[in-house]
C-alpha cells in the first residue's frame, strides 16, 4: 500500500514540475529549474539521502486547501510572466478561525471539568449541619449581644491603629498560623470569628489593609474620630456587659446546682420517682439489713435476720479470713494493734467487675487497682475513727460496705472488733466490756451464723473467744470453727495430733457445725490475694496433716470455707425470713391501730415531712412581713425612735439651751448640739431601732396563734429558726451614712410653712413636756412622801427622811417664788441660807440633799413654765411667719420641736423604705438558708421536732419500709427457687 501511494506521489510531482504554474513577483520572470524543487521521496530512483516519508494522499492542492506539512519553495522553470495570486487574507482568516475554535473548545471542556471537580469536592466535604449541637448556644447568640455598629464606630482609624498596635506583625503571624490550622473544613469557626469586626485588630498587615480598603477605611471622612479614652471606655463597657451576662449565667447555674443538691438530699422524703433497677437477691437482703441496723440502733432492739458474724481474739486473723473470702485486701492492717474499731458489714455478691462501694456513697473502688485499694482502706479507717466518740476506743456504729466480683459467694458478713483480755494504755477503761457487749449483741441473734476464728499458732488454753461462743451457742447449731495460721502451727506444735483434736472438736469446750483449717498468708501485709492462694494450696498439697489423713480435703482452704458458709447462710435465710416478715407485719398492725386511736384526724407525717410542712409555714409568715402597710411601719418606727432619743433631746439639748438669756444664744446652742448628735449617735440609734422593730414584727408573725389550725409541735422549730435568722442578719452598713445626710438636712431646715405644722409642733411639745412633768411629779412624791389626803385615807405616814425633804421642798419653793427667773443651779450662799433656815426650825440638812431636791423642784417649775409658754405660742405663728421681733413672744422652742418632729418623720420614712425594699428580703433569704441547714442536720431535726406523735409516725414509716422490702425479698427468693 505504501508503494502504491509513493508511485502516485511521483506522478503528481512530475506533473507539477512540467506544468506552467508560476508566482507573480516584482522581479523579472525566471523559469523554475527542476532540480531546485525541494521535493524528495524515499522510493524515487534518483534519491540519494533517506528522509522521513511524506504521508500524503491523492488530492489536488489549491490556495484554499490546508497548507502542506513542509514548505516548498517554487521557482520558475520557464521564461515568461505568470499571474501572481495573493491569498494572505484567506490564510489569516483560517488561522483566526483555528484559534477561536481552540479557545471555545478549551473553555467548554475546562468549564465542564471544573464543574465535575467542584461536585466531587463538594461530595467529599462532610455535612457540618449535623454537628451544630457541639457549638455552645451562646456562639449563635453573639450577634444579639454584640452591637457591631457600636464596635465599628469604636474601632480606631488606620493611623491610630498603628499606634495602638505596635506588635502588629507578630500578632498577624500568629493569626495566620492559627487560620492555617483551622481553615480546612472548619467553615463554622470562621463564621463565628467573622461575626465580630474585632478581627481588624487581630489580622495580618496585608489583611488589615485589604479590609480597610473594602470597608472604606481609606477615606478619613467616613467615620468620626474619637479620642483614645472614649474608645477604651466603650470597649470596657462591652467587656463589662459580657462579664455581667456570664456572671448571671454562673449565678443561675449555682442556684440550680443548689436546688438539685437539695432534691437529692430529700429524694426519699419527697417520693421522687426514679427508674427502678433490678437488684440482685443479696443486694435486696443487704438493704433490709441496713434499714434494720438503723431501726435497731434507734429503738434498742435486735432483729433476727441471718448474717455471718465473724468473731475472734485480737490478731487471730479475722480480717485476713474475710479478705480471702472477699478476694481483696480491703481492710486497714496493723501489726498487733487494734485496727477494727467498729462493726463492718460486708455484702458479697457476684458481678462482672471486682468493685466495692459504701452504702451512703456512689463512688466505686476498683479492687484490681492498688491505688483504689489504698484509698478504700484509708476511707474505712477514717470512717471507723469518725464513728468512735470522744473518750472511747470502739464504736457500735456499723459501717456498710458492698463488694462485687466474679466468683464471690453471696452472703452478708459482719467483722467485729477482736476480743481482748487486757486493756492497754491509750484505750478507754471500758473497752473490753464494750467489745464483749457488741459481740454478744450480734451473736445472741438466734439466726446469726457465728464464724469463730482461732489462731492455730498459739496455745488453745489462751483462747478467749471460744468460751464466749460456747456461751452464746452451746449446742453449736450455728457455729463454724476456723483455725488460722495452720502453717505456723504445723511448724511450732510438737504433736500434730493436737491440730487434729482441734479440727475434730475434741480440744475446745465448744461445738460447731463444721471445722476448717486455712492459711491466710505469711504475715506480710503487702502480699496479694493470688500469692496467698497459691501459698495456701501449695502448703496443703505438701502438708503432713493431709498426707497422714489428720485433715480431710473438704476441711481446708478458704475456698471450701466460703462455699460452706454461703450454703449455711442461705439455708438459714430461707428458714427464718418469712417468720421475720410476719413479726414486722404484726408490729405494723399494732402501730397503725395506736395511731388511729390517738390521732384519728391527722395524717401520718414523719419527722422529715413535718419539717417540710413547718418550713412552708415559716416562709409564709416571713412573706407576711411584706404585707405590712407603710403607715404601720412608719408609726412604729417613729414612736420607738422618739422613745429612745427623747431623753437625750430634753436633757442634753432643750433644757441647756432654754437656760440661755436670748434667742440667738438659744439657736446657736441648739444647732451645735444637734450637729454633734447627728454626727455621732443619731444614725446608729435609728438603725438599732429599725432592726429591733423588724425583729419584733417578725416575732409577732412567728408566735401569734392561728386558732384551731395552730400546731404546737412546730413551736420549738420556729423559735430556733427565728433566733438563728436574727443572729445571722446584719443591717446594711451603708444605711448609717445615708441616714446621717438625710437627718442632718432635716434638722437644718427651720422654715415652718403653714399653721397646721405649727400646731402639730405645739401639740408634740406639749405631749412631751406633759410626760416629763408627770415623771417629775412622781419623783417628787417619792421624795417627800404621801400628802395629807393619802395619809388620812390610806393611813400612810412619812418617814423621817421624807419629812426632811418635805421641809426642804417648802423652803426651795419659797425661793423660786421670790425669784421666778432663777437660774437652774443654786448658788452656795443660797444653799447656806436654806440650810440655816431649816436649822432654825431644828432640822439638820445635808447640802447635797438640798441640791438634789432643788433639781426636781426647779425641773417641775421649768416644765410648767414651758407648758404655759406653749399656750402663748399658739397665736404666734403669724409673728413667726412675718419675722416680727417681739421679746415677749419668742417661740424658738416650738421651732426646735418642729425640727425634731420632722426629722423623726423623715427618718421613719427612710427606714421604712430600707425595711421593705432590702432588709425584709435579706431576712427572708437568711430564713431560707437556716431552714436548708436544718434540713441537712438530722440531729437538729430530732432535737426540735419531738413528741409521741412524731415518734409514732417515725416507727410506722420504718416498719412499713422494712416489711415492704422483706416481702419483695421473699418474692424474689421464691422466684429464684
From Swiss-Prot:
Post-translational modification, briefly? Cleaved by OMA1 or YME1L downstream of the transmembrane region in response to different signals to generate soluble forms. Cleaved by OMA1 at position S1 following stress conditions, generating the short soluble form (Dynamin-like GTPase OPA1, short form; S-OPA1).
Where's the transit peptide in this chain? 1-86
Residues annotated as signal peptide: none
Region annotation (G4 motif) ranges: 484-487
Region G1 motif: which residues?
312-319
Please name one Pfam family that this protein belongs to: OPA1_C
List residues in topological domain: Mitochondrial intermembrane: 113-787, 799-977
What keywords are annotated for this sequence in UniProt?
A: Apoptosis, Coiled coil, Disulfide bond, GTP-binding, Hydrolase, Lipid-binding, Magnesium, Membrane, Metal-binding, Mitochondrion, Mitochondrion inner membrane, Nucleotide-binding, Transit peptide, Transmembrane, Transmembrane helix
Q: Where is this region: Paddle region?
A: 753-873
Coiled-coil annotated spans: 224-271, 911-977
Domains (record comment):
The paddle region plays a major role in driving mitochondrial inner membrane fusion. It binds lipid membranes enriched in negatively charged phospholipids, such as cardiolipin, and promotes membrane tubulation. A conserved intramembrane region, named membrane insertion loop (MIL), within the paddle region inserts deeply into the bilayer, further stabilizing the interactions with cardiolipin-enriched membranes. OPA1 dimerization through the paddle domain promotes the helical assembly of a flexible OPA1 lattice on the membrane, driving mitochondrial fusion in cells.
The name of this protein is Dynamin-like GTPase OPA1, mitochondrial
| Biological source species | Gallus gallus
Gene designation per UniProt:
OPA1
